[in-house]
Each structure stands twice: as C-alpha cells, then as structure tokens.
C-alpha cells in the first residue's frame, strides 16, 4: 500500500509525542512520525498515482491544520488526535479521492469516511478509553503546521517514508 501523507512540523510532532508519552510511556517503543494520511493507494498503477499526486502537490506550500480533540478509533484499535476536515488538507484529499477513490483503502476512499488524524497509540489489548482520557488531560486544541507532503509505503511489519 502506497500512502500520501501530510508531514507535521517538528513543534507539533513534539507536542503530540509529549501527550503520548505522558499517558503511555512504554507505548510500542516506536517514535511518533507526525503525519496525517491523505490517501492509501492499493491500485496497480503506482507510477500513475504518484505522477498525479506530484502534479497536484507541486504548488502546495506549508499550510495549517487544527487539531480539535482526541478520540478512540475502535475499529483500528488506536487513540488519535483528530484534525478538522477543512482548508488545504481537505481540498487535497477530496481531489485525490475524486480521481482515485476506487483504488484507495476503505478509510481514505471517500470524503464521507476519511477522518484526518494522527495516531498516538496503537495497542489492541489496552484499555483505550482509559488511555485516551489520560492523554486528554494533557491535550488542548492547537494549530499544527504541515511542512510537506510525502509518500510512504506500508510494508509488514511497518512502513517506509
């Protein structure tokens, strides 16, 4: 699976990491890679998809997103910081989904199901509502900077940026 991700600035990644570590210091041992997934492509023509995205993104510079709250996404066993589905972020996702929606995964294939977020913890066996409440004690809504758009590849057991 080939993903298009919006990369967070260092300050925002550090802020989310601090929230994560305060509530789950042992987490899964991996550093937080601050990003929001715009699209997860599962089709056959990766070169065409990448060329389309590169053309779409060529004039996109830094932009802001607003993180509003934390939530448990039970279907995927994660605690996430949720961002507003507005502005440049939403426009980019919408355009990719319009053209490639049928080749995107179930979570990014349409505007109706896409939920822009940054995963803070993936732990299927944890009491995620309790962890989320603990993280929420250190969370306040904030504006984050998006400093670039990148491709990443999901490969067992992880991903490559």
What spans do the regions from the language model cover?
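Structural motif corresponding to the early beta-alpha repeats
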Residues: 64, 74-80
């Amino acid at each position: 699976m080939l993903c298009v991700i919006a990369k967070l600035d260092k300050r925002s990644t550090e802020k989310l990491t601090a929230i994560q570590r305060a509530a789950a210091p042992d987490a899964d041992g991996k550093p937080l890679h601050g990003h929001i997934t715009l699209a997860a492509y599962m089709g056959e023509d990766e070169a065409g998809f990448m060329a389309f995205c590169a053309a779409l993104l060529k004039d996109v510079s830094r932009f802001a997103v607003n993180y509003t709250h934390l939530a448990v996404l039970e279907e995927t066993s994660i605690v996430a910081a949720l961002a507003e589905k507005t502005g440049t972020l939403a426009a980019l996702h919408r355009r990719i989904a319009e053209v490639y929606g049928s080749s995107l995964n179930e979570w990014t294939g349409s505007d109706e199901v896409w939920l822009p977020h940054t995963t803070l913890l993936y732990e299927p066996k944890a009491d995620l509502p309790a962890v989320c409440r603990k993280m929420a004690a250190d969370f306040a809504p904030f504006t984050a900077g998006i400093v670039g758009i990148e491709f990443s590849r999901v490969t067992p057991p992880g991903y490559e940026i």
